[in-house]
Amino acid sequence: MLDIDVFIEKIKKKSRLIGIDPGGKRIGVAISDENKIVATPFSTIVKNKYSVFIKDIKKIVEENHIKGIVIGNPINMDGSPSQSSQSAKDLAINLSKDITENIILWDERLSSQGAFNLSGDLGSNTSKKVKKLDENSAQFILQGFLDYLSKKNTWSDTVKGL
């Protein structure tokens, strides 16, 4: 895992990122555009063996020219680590060994609720919403990082101009 400033420096060029919502049974995946402005839901991977998961993620990374991974870190509302935080950290460590070192953990507070609320376009069909919830949560996590990145870049450009 990288410090956020180091991560940002390594992904500066036009490149795509993936966002991962690590869940107990399923893992949501979202992908950004090359300019790192918009996150789009991509897929949901059913948790099986780690080797199968790594194969699936490697394929996504290679086929989509991914340069960095943003993993949702499920922390409590008060900022303290949740029970699932260690699982997210372990996943980040393993992915950094198996795929790329360009990985950060990103605060995912309220991502599942936000994703569920934003899925209103699926109508009142709750089973459809639940089916898409993981990849929508990954989109919510990745979009949060992209928005942060955009604000950071805007602020940096403003300061340079002074």
Describe every region a protein language model picked out.
Residues 1-18, 25, 30-162:
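Phosphate- and other anionic-substrate recognition elements at nucleic-acid/protein interfaces
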